[in-house]
A protein has these predicted regions:
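Glycine-rich beta-strand-centered segment in the early N-terminal region that forms part
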Residues: 20-36, 50-101, 142-144
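Adenosine-nucleotide cofactor-binding segment
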Residues: 176-179, 191-254
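Helix-to-beta-strand junctions that scaffold the AdoMet/dcAdoMet cofactor pocket
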Residues: 259-260
Length: 346
């Protein structure tokens, strides 16, 4: 079978691989992949060969935002059957370490996450024609939900976890800085959680247009209007919660004037270390929380999409055949023309 593999910076190839035996063992499921979304981490591997201190040391099959059809199931599998459409959770916690035992699987000491070079040998990803996964990683897709929409379960789960980190949002005024796929989904999840006012910022027009489509109350092009947030800084600030989805120090620092005393900042984007004005943070009693991946939120994401509670379709901008992966990755790298680019495997 064929897969999309990264060998190093700008060394992306569609090539034949020897996958594990596709006859599933006990508790395993073989899934024929239909759609796969290109994530920011995939782009880091493509452009830089990794991120931070993590570097590709062997060919790495990319991809962790995928959906497909069950090809076969192993002995004892009950939650899915051959022919079922599924979203595949890329996260496989060990279940036995102290964090898993405390219900904090996101911090698992032996985590295996699709398409990751954080451990060696690397954990291969799901941008391949077929994958073998544990039964617990499969979530049924129902009704008219498309394969592309089902593949958005992973980024939606990331944002649902971020919303859980934010605390109560009923009646909240929310600022989202960075309106890429994650920022847009954070806005949608915040609205579903009860936020009554959502303002979004970005430096590119396309993401802001998508924010408008999903119902943001106001959008601000910070590149064109660098002082536009100052209007929200009166009386010590306006927003109850900030979702910082850009990973940019300037975005986080700029939000501090606009957040009210006692407000909560959830740092979603990862862009490296930042220098923060601690005096302002202390004086305004601002809480800053990190958010990383997800666990139970993946099942919630699929359930919400199955029930039509969140429409992820506006975030999908282009779909290309997986054999055109190089063109797809270049397209996904251009924020002026693309939001979420997906690969079609069927």
């Amino acid at each position: 079978m064929q897969a999309v593999r990264c060998h190093g910076p700008h060394e992306l190839k569609v090539e034949d691989i020897e996958g594990p035996g596709m006859a599933p063992g006990a508790g395993e499921v073989s899934v024929r992949i239909e759609r796969g979304g290109i994530c920011g981490s995939d782009l880091h591997y493509y452009h830089d060969g990794g991120f931070g201190t993590v570097r590709i040391k062997e060919p790495l099959t990319l991809g962790h935002e995928v959906s497909g059809v069950v090809a076969a199931v192993g002995a004892g599998v009950k939650r899915v059957a051959a022919g079922d459409r599924v979203a595949v959770n890329p996260s496989r916690a060990c279940g036995t370490c102290r964090y898993c035992q405390r219900g904090e699987q996101v911090h698992c000491l032996d985590m295996r996450f699709f398409g990751s070079a954080m451990r060696f040998p690397h954990v291969q990803g799901a941008f391949s024609e077929q994958v073998l996964v544990d039964e617990a990683q499969c979530f049924k897709v129902l009704g008219s939900l498309t394969a592309g929409e089902a593949a958005m379960a992973e980024p939606l789960a990331v944002c649902l976890h971020a919303v859980n980190q934010a605390g109560p949002l009923v009646g909240a005024k929310v600022l989202v800085t960075g309106s890429g796929p994650i920022g847009v989904l954070c806005a949608a999840a915040a609205r579903r959680a009860g936020a009554t006012e959502i303002v979004a910022t970005d430096v590119a027009p396309l993401p802001l247009k998508t924010m408008e489509r999903i119902g943001a109350d106001a959008v601000i092009d910070i590149a064109a209007q660098p002082d536009a947030l100052k209007g929200f800084s009166q009386d010590k600030g306006t927003f109850d919660v900030v979702f910082e989805a850009s990973g940019r120090e300037a975005a986080l620092v700029g939000a501090l004037d606009a957040i009210r005393p006692g407000g909560r900042i959830v740092q979603v984007g990862i862009g490296g270390d930042m220098k923060l004005p601690m005096t302002q943070i202390v004086a305004k009693e601002i809480s800053i929380r990190g958010t990383f991946r997800f666990h139970e939120e993946f099942g919630t994401a699929v359930d919400m999409m199955n029930k039509g509670l969140i429409d992820v379709s506006p975030r999908i901008s282009q779909t290309l055949p997986f054999r055109q992966a190089l063109a797809a990755f270049d397209l996904a790298s251009d924020r002026s023309t693309a939001m979420k680019v997906q690969l079609a495997f069927s």
